[in-house]
Amino acid sequence: MGSISLSNSMPITRLPLLTSLYHQSFLPISSSSFSLLPLSNRRRSSTFSPSITVSAFFAAPASVNNNNSVPAKNGGYTVGDFMTPRQNLHVVKPSTSVDDALELLVEKKVTGLPVIDDNWTLVGVVSDYDLLALDSISGRSQNDTNLFPDVDSTWKTFNELQKLISKTYGKVVGDLMTPSPLVVRDSTNLEDAARLLLETKFRRLPVVDADGKLIGILTRGNVVRAALQIKRETENST
């Protein structure tokens, strides 16, 4: 991937505001909102579980005396308190070859990458599923509850995976990425973002600023770390 230079970009003026998990209205983006294109534009639908509760994990302790703790803001934590910042991210461009993106996934031991332009404006996300078109073989895989899958079936799937990799030559990330993904802001309430990750079953949420530039990523691992830290702080404050 070529070098990335920073410069000003056109601001995002209209993004769909996620008003609920099922209904959307088009409004100017606000400092604490999510954004999402209509689900018809996304490759795979998500399974929602409205019964999930995360409030208990992210309620700020009444008083904390810990120099290593992240301070609560307005009685709660925000995405910016626990996200992985931009300087620690691995990113690709639409022009990055699929082979290079796959090598980056393997080298960095991640399952997905933000896709940016030369100005760090987020233009999409791409996952290992996208890059290898794994949807084409996942439907024929063994049931997830099968602890010991059939050897012949597993070997057949592995062979199909090898064939998929052989077909990536000449393709670029822009051909396979998911454009205009669901995003959050660094000021978004952490509990809201955690609930969104749980209910959509996404692995990560890009974090953007008011101009749509990538400033971080909130992953499931970040949420687990936050829950553990807040639990310790709550215990220490009692």
From Swiss-Prot:
This is CBS domain-containing protein CBSX2, chloroplastic. It is found in: Plastid, Chloroplast stroma. Residues 1-71 form a transit peptide. It comes from the Eukaryota. Residues 83-145, 177-234 form the CBS domain. Keywords: CBS domain, Chloroplast, Plastid, Repeat, Transit peptide. The keyword Metal-binding does not apply.
